[in-house]
């Protein structure tokens, strides 16, 4: 096990949630490269309602599927009541370890609306774990498989003394990683919720991403890779959302500016590209985009109860693919279908509807609706 080395702040090491060892064939290949990991831990005062929170790093040696043995750094955040059921949460390739603002980490998180009092992901009743995906900092210039992400999560659980997750909630790319985790480490997971993520990359979506990566490559040829990345993100926004939403939001006549036509959606797309470039290393985007297209599992290998959430009109993960996934899961799988104008981004917009699904899926013995 990896030993936690706390910082100078008020600290409490994460409690071991289950003393039993859980062997896993895939995990037997993972060894820690260092017995030490740094952690920044917060324990609230006795009269505080704030849950404990820890943010830390550790180093592992991981045999990657397409890149051989690598020394990798994992960055994680764990927030919630000690001894509460642990739920791992993972999002799209832009997501990170910080889910939502807390007493000790007050900055806004990427899934703010779904985490909080009264929600299925309530730190008062769940312990929420997340990490930065392998490759997210841009330092890993090698093919990254979703299986690598799943094995890294298993190594993180070992380091934190967590034998088994109560739930894994994955959105988009996180759903692909969740399916891999459920396939490779089934003994360590009770329930999977996979939102807008299938057992394979749809050929249409893979073609979209291939063109986005070519946009980045053209930018690199012109020594303007950030312009290429911004353009790739703008293309992506068209695939994340739906024609219906664009019709409602941007149905204004074009303008003539300096003799050029500018359509109503361009300001929105420009802002989306600029924001993405400001926070995303080019190499991180390229390698994680490729990782989506490398993803493929056999649904029959997923041996845990799995709730699959599909969105009608999702152009990246069509409903038909998720129907095929659930059919392959057999009695372990169930399907929920949402109608939303937000397409692939519905998991970030349809907060109450997603929360209702999570509440049912993650309910523990003795809990009521």
UniProtKB/Swiss-Prot annotation:
Q: Where is this site: Important for acyl-CoA specificity?
A: 209
Q: In which pathway does it act?
A: Amino-acid biosynthesis; L-methionine biosynthesis via de novo pathway; O-succinyl-L-homoserine from L-homoserine: step 1/1
Q: Which residues form the AB hydrolase-1 domain?
A: 86-350
Q: Which UniProt keywords apply?
A: Acyltransferase, Amino-acid biosynthesis, Cytoplasm, Methionine biosynthesis, Transferase
Q: Which GO terms describe its cellular component?
A: cytoplasm
Question: Which residues does the annotation list for site: Important for substrate specificity?
Answer: 173
On the tree of life, the source organism's domain of life is Bacteria
Q: What is its EC number?
A: 2.3.1.46
Reaction equation(s) it catalyzes: L-homoserine + succinyl-CoA = O-succinyl-L-homoserine + CoA
User: Which GO BP terms sit in this record?
Assistant: methionine biosynthetic process
Provide the primary localization.
Answer: cytoplasm
What name does UniProt use for this protein? Homoserine O-succinyltransferase
Pfam hit, one: Abhydrolase_1
What role is this protein assigned? Transfers a succinyl group from succinyl-CoA to L-homoserine, forming succinyl-L-homoserine.
Annotated active site: 172 (nucleophile), 314, 344
Alphabetized GO MF terms: homoserine O-acetyltransferase activity; homoserine O-succinyltransferase activity
């Amino acid at each position: 096990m990896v030993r936690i080395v706390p910082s100078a702040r008020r600290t409490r090491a994460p409690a071991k949630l289950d003393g039993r060892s859980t062997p896993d064939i895939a995990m037997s290949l993972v060894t820690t490269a260092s017995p030490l990991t740094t952690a920044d831990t917060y324990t609230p005062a006795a009269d505080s309602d704030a849950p404990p929170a820890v943010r830390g790093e550790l180093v592992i040696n991981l045999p990657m599927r397409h890149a051989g043995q690598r020394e990798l750094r994992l960055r994680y955040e764990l927030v919630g009541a000690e001894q509460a059921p642990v739920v791992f949460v993972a999002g799209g390739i832009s997501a990170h370890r910080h889910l939502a603002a807390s007493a000790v980490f007050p900055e806004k998180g990427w899934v703010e609306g779904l985490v909080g009092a009264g929600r299925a992901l309530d730190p008062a009743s769940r312990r929420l774990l997340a990490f930065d995906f392998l490759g997210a900092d841009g330092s890993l210039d090698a093919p990254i498989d979703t299986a690598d992400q799943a094995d890294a999560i298993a190594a993180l659980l070992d380091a934190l003394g967590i034998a088994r997750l109560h739930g894994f909630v994955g959105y988009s790319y996180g759903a692909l990683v969740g399916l891999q985790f459920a396939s490779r480490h089934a003994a360590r997971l009770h329930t999977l919720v996979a939102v807008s993520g299938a057992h394979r990359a749809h050929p249409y979506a893979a073609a979209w991403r291939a063109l986005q990566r070519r946009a980045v490559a053209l930018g690199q040829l012109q020594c303007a890779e950030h312009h290429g990345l911004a353009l790739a993100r703008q293309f992506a926004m068209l695939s994340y959302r739906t024609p219906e939403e664009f019709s409602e939001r941007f149905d204004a006549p074009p303008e003539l500016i300096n003799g050029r036509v500018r359509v109503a959606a361009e300001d929105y797309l420009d802002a989306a590209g600029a924001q993405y470039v400001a926070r995303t290393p080019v190499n991180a985007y390229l390698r994680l985009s490729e990782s989506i297209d490398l993803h493929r599992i056999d649904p029959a290998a997923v041996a845990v109860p799995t709730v699959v959430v599909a969105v009608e009109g999702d152009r990246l993960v069509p409903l038909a693919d998720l129907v095929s996934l659930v059919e392959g899961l057999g009695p372990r799988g169930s399907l929920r279908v949402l109608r939303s104008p937000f397409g692939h981004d519905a998991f970030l917009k349809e907060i109450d509807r997603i929360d209702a699904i999570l509440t049912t899926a993650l309910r523990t013995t003795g809990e009521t609706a």
